[in-house]
Amino acid sequence: MAMLRTDLEFSMLPKLGTRPVRWRIADGLVAYEAAVEMMEREVAAIGEGGDELVWLVEHPPLYTAGTSANASDLVQPDRFPVFATGRGGEYTYHGPGQRVAYVMLDLKRRRQDVRAFVAALEEVVIRTLDMMNVRGERREDRVGVWVRRPEKPLLPDGTMAEDKIAALGIRLRKWVTFHGLSLNVDPDLDHFSGIVPCGISTYGVTSLVDLGLPVMMADVDIRLRAAFETVFGETTNDA
């Protein structure tokens, strides 16, 4: 259960002259196909010099399969719609009560380092959780953000139980990023049982509400934006 080294470099502040990142929050539930179409349009525009964008959404219940997904990890294929996606990673769940942040940035304006970008997304989640007195942690062999659960039984190898609270999956096109992260605020955790989340069966899944924090999505969004700005720089409201 080794943590990543503490000197991990994740700064993704923009170069001088870069315009603020547009910050957009969707109303209601967004169909996955519509989200992908929106990302495709935005990524093309950003690649041509348009302003970068972070888009916060919630989806209806669905599963997505990343480029490394193993068919055997889709335990209940008929439970919810399943979408193949070009992001990295394996199967994951999206649904109401989960904040999905689609992060569309031009790394040529920042730092052309994919590993640092992934670490930066993890850092945004870790700092968001810290504002709510939750300790999120990285793991060397598992992408995402994890929470230790000392109240749960030990794992078979004798180590402390851990649950995943945030998942990451990204894709790049000409150094423009899309897809992003999902943070479990108050989703129905039983919905994760239809898959082996991210191909990892040893560990569970948790949420802020599951951890005893009855937070509202709007409160999480405020903290998420503040954390994002410390890692990626200034944002501006987008219609």
Curated annotation (Swiss-Prot):
Listed CDD domains: LipB
Localization per record: Cytoplasm
Enzyme's top EC category: transferase
GO biological process, one term: protein modification process
Gene Ontology terms for molecular function: lipoyl(octanoyl) transferase activity
Entry keyword set: Acyltransferase, Cytoplasm, Transferase
Annotated active site: C198
Record keyword Transferase present: yes
Biochemical pathway: Protein modification; protein lipoylation via endogenous pathway; protein N(6)-(lipoyl)lysine from octanoyl-[acyl-carrier-protein]: step 1/2
Predominant subcellular localization, coarse grouping: cytoplasm
Misc note: In the reaction, the free carboxyl group of octanoic acid is attached via an amide linkage to the epsilon-amino group of a specific lysine residue of lipoyl domains of lipoate-dependent enzymes.
Designated name of the protein: Octanoyltransferase
Organism: Rhizobium etli (strain ATCC 51251 / DSM 11541 / JCM 21823 / NBRC 15573 / CFN 42)
